[in-house]
Amino acid sequence: MKYLLAALLTLSFYSMADDELQKEGNWFFKSQVNKMTDSTDVVAINGSKDVYTKRGLERNTSLVLRCNENQTDAYLSIYDYLGSGSPRITVRYDGGKPKKSIWQGGEGGNSAFAPNAVSFIKELAKHKTAVIGFEPYGSTMQAVEFDLSGVDVMAKKIAEACNWKL
């Protein structure tokens, strides 16, 4: 009976479709073949454990890396409104010196896209943690920390899907 159970578990593991949600380190990711282009799309999401409260509501923040239709994106997704412009984002890796830059605001005002996603992902892959600071509309600076464990695997998957070297 033990062998039958082990065989069934092994078969179910090998038959798992690429397009199912999977986990690597602190990242949840999904890969699937785009039916329109036959290219592989990959999306990886890392949710920060840091939460802030605004107007009585808890606000969550996620870091998203993706290859979609051969385009690489890296962005901060916020359960809040950042404004309609280009948000100023501060990133601090592994307790090092914080670096400020201007990111591109996403449609709807609840996300901010890194100006050079490939460089940003390559930099993430060198570190264990990242603290990202941002100012939601009508609020003060919020800083959230991301445990980047598994980011090297995510970076490799995205680089392969979008045809760039890590």
Residue locations for each model-derived region?
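Sec-dependent N-terminal signal peptides
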Residues: 3-14
